[in-house]
């Protein structure tokens, strides 16, 4: 981790685009970002409806790359710290990892399928929930940093064109 600045972006695609442009050649580390977060972020950057993308991924259980070829226009190098069993491809969720690492599990009282705009209090609670998830993702990453370094080392061994 070379950059340690927190960015809280709420309903501001221009600010998200500026963050993406400033970091687009970097490695984006996350928990399940390969299958979820990158598609939500790319969709917002492309002016798509993130709720429709979310439902495609979660409700319909479809792959993000199937939603739109336009996602390919936005390069994003992802490193996903979500562990999976190589034989069964079953994944381990972040809350399970938090238990394994001895962390407190934080949940939110804000209903994810709410049909109205969030109140200011609900937004603050959601930011707190997301911040905790990011902190736990960093903790998982630091536990697996040797794996990241090995993968990064292999990639660096190949010449760039």
PLM features: what roles do these ranges have?
Residues 2-96:
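Conserved DEDDh/DEDDy metal-dependent 3′-5′ exonuclease domain
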Residues 29, 84-161:
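Acidic, Mg2+-coordinating catalytic module of metal-dependent nucleases/exonucleases
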């Amino acid at each position: 981790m070379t950059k340690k600045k927190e960015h809280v972006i709420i309903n501001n695609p221009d600010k998200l685009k500026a963050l993406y442009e400033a970091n687009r050649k970097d490695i984006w580390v996350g928990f399940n970002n390969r299958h979820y977060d990158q598609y939500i972020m790319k969709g917002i950057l492309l002016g798509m409806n993130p709720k429709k993308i979310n439902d495609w991924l979660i409700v319909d259980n479809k792959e993000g790359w199937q939603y739109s070829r336009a996602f390919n226009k936005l390069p994003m190098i992802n490193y996903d710290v979500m562990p999976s069993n190589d034989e069964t491809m079953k994944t381990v969720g972040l809350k399970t990892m938090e238990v394994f690492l001895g962390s407190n599990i934080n949940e939110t009282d804000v209903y994810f399928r709410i049909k109205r705009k969030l109140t200011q209090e609900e937004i603050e609670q959601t930011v707190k929930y997301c911040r905790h998830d990011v902190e736990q993702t960093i903790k998982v990453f630091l536990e697996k940093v040797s794996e990241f370094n090995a993968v990064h080392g292999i990639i660096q061994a190949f010449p760039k064109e």
